[in-house]
Every structure is written in C-alpha cells, then in structure tokens.
From Swiss-Prot:
The lineage of its organism: Eukaryota, Metazoa, Chordata, Craniata, Vertebrata. It is found in: Cell membrane. Keywords: Cell membrane, Glycoprotein, Membrane, Transmembrane, Transmembrane helix. The gene is Tmem150a. Regulates localization of phosphatidylinositol 4-kinase (PI4K) to the plasma membrane, possibly by reducing the association of TTC7 (TTC7A or TTC7B) with the PI4K complex. Acts as a regulator of phosphatidylinositol 4-phosphate (PtdIns(4)P) synthesis. May also play a role in fasting-induced catabolism. Residues 1-2, 97-108, 162-178, 233-271 are cytoplasmic. This is Transmembrane protein 150A. The keyword Membrane applies. It is a multi-pass membrane protein. InterPro entries: DRAM/TMEM150_Autophagy_Mod (IPR050911), Frag1/DRAM/Sfk1 (IPR019402).
C-alpha cells in the first residue's frame, strides 16, 4: 500500500467539503437562495428590516446553481481555489491510472481516450473556477460544458476498463458500484441540461438540484480510485509519461526497472 491511495479520497473530501462551504457562504451572504426553497418571484423589493440569514424573497437570479454560489466574493475566492486545486488533482489521478493500466499491459484506445477526457475535464474545471458566470458568461458556460461532458465520458470509459479487468468478487462489486454511479451521472446531467433550457422557476431549481447530484456523484466516483491506488509505485508515473513508440519494456534477463510492462505481443490486451 502506498500514500497515493490518499489522493482520490483527498480530492473527494476536499472538493465536496469545499463546494458545500461555498454554498453555505453564498446563502448566508444572501447571494443565492437555499436549495429547499422552491418559491420564486418575478422581482423582490429590498427589505431593510431583513438582516442576515437566508433570503426570504427569491428570483430566478437566486437559483442555487453551483456556479452561481461561487460568483461573488468572498465565496468566489474559495470557489476558484477549489477549481484550480481540484483540476490538478484530477489530472494527476487520470495520469496515474493511465500509467497503472499500462503497467498491466493494457495499452488500448479506451485507456488513451480516458486519459484525454480526464485531462479535458481538469481543463474545464480551471475555466469554470476562474471565470464566474456573471462576469464571463460565455467562457464559463463553455468551461462547464467541457468539464461536465468530459467528466461523464471519463467515468463511463473507466467503468468499461475496470469491468474488463475485474477478476475477483470484490472487483465485480466495485465494477457494479461504478456502473451505478455512471448511470446516475448520465441521468442527472441530461435532466440538468433539459431543465436549464426552460425559464420555469421550478425547472430551473430542478436543474440546480440535478447539477449538485451530478457533481457529487462524479467526485465520489473519483474517490473510488483509492481501491486501485494502493499498488501504485514510482514506476507508474514513469510508465505514463513515456512516449508510446519508445516505451521501455522489461525483458526476462534485464535488470531495468523503468516500467513493469510485459512486451510479449500476445500479452497486450486491447481493452
């Protein structure tokens, strides 16, 4: 077991705690309305007697979308920090998992595509975290679309990769868990997108709830990589960073420890 096992758990714990903290700050600073509020008005008049605490009068501008929660300071500062640090951790997890599969002689187009989608997800998170929706709407929406779509593709591809590599009952149980998480992610992302396109306050609020479920679901999925990361070594990162054509392979008579790859053609699994 290595310290790398803490990386996926840290990503999940840090990000989930962070975005809920951002939400709590936004509610207390009256920048969004609570998720339990389903009543929205066309407009609200300022009430001088209403000091602190959640809003009692809400408009569509107060729907608690995750991005909306991180629009205004001070919560926007924490939101950007979460986006940037989360992106680095996501990219590192994707790279390590890619290298780990290469060590297992599982160099396939699915593994390569999963790496690309994971890194694309990380890039989208950087854009989302640093370009707030009220100040750079187009860039923020592009970043959100890229991050969410790439994140969904990443979890689906890794469901396939893990299922085909499962050998024990515990592996199969983890494969089923990840499949359930992938299905939940797909359903909530589709519903969030459909609801968001409508101007109905109820559907907009539903879009916000689906978005929260989607993001939490994806973060939990990333956390499950701790199951595999106990076997990661320093050679894993080397395997991931080596270019494909010149990847060194360990022969039976060689003392090289650059990778754990087996070069026998018949041992290379294509999925």
């Amino acid at each position: 077991m290595t310290a790398w096992i803490l990386l996926p758990v840290s990503l999940s714990a840090f990000s989930i705690t962070g975005i809920w903290t951002v939400y709590a700050m936004a509610v207390m600073n009256r920048h969004v309305c609570p998720v339990e509020n389903w009543s929205y008005n066309e407009s609200c008049s300022p009430d001088p007697a209403e000091q602190g605490g959640p809003k009692s009068c809400c408009t569509l501008d107060d729907v608690p979308l995750i991005s909306k929660c991180g629009t205004y300071p001070p919560e926007s500062c924490l939101f950007s920090l979460i986006g940037n640090m989360g992106a680095v951790m996501v990219a590192l997890i994707c790279l390590l998992r890619y290298g780990q599969l290469l060590e297992q002689s599982r160099h396939s187009w699915i593994n390569t595509t999963a790496l690309i989608t994971g890194c694309t997800n990380a890039a989208g998170l950087v854009v989302v975290g640093n370009f707030q929706v009220d100040h750079a709407k187009s860039l923020h929406y592009i970043g959100t679309g890229v991050a969410f779509t790439a994140g969904l593709l990443f979890v689906c591809l890794h469901c396939v990769l893990f299922y085909h590599g499962a050998t024990t009952p515990l592996d199969m149980a983890m494969a089923y868990l990840r499949s359930v998480l992938a299905v939940i992610a797909f359903i909530t992302l589709v519903l969030s997108g459909v609801f968001f396109l409508h101007e109905s306050s109820q559907l907009q609020h539903g879009a916000a709830l689906c978005e929260w479920v989607f993001v939490l679901d994806i973060l939990i999925f990333y956390g499950t990589f701790s199951y595999e990361f106990g076997t990661i070594s320093s050679d894993t990162l080397v395997a991931a960073l080596q270019p494909a054509p010149g990847r060194a392979c360990k022969s039976s008579g060689s003392s090289s420890t650059s990778t754990h790859l087996n070069c026998a053609p018949e041992s290379i699994a294509m999925i």
